[in-house]
């Protein structure tokens, strides 16, 4: 697990960047695979998601990930009723408290955003296609809407 010193100074958010270590998956997906869309055993992925949820202090049911497709699409959650998992997109922006948002990466970059004034968090999956097509810019725009 890795933490940003800059983000740790904010007491009202928890964050963490995970590597592939210390999970339950075996073989090609060893070890901390959190991709439900992968060919990994579902029981191992669910155990990995439970582990991640505990580490960041949220319920597994409140950990939101996306069906990432290397796009520039940003999913926004402005209220509890908006929150759904496995929507298609490559970034999440949220004003909703007490949920976890997650981006899954292999060789792409994960980017975490935080606006302490407006209490908005976001994360983006930035592969070369998404970066070239504006995933970072689109995520920042959602913070300003």
Predicted regions: what they are:
Residues 1-145:
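Active-site microenvironment for binding and transforming phosphate-containing groups
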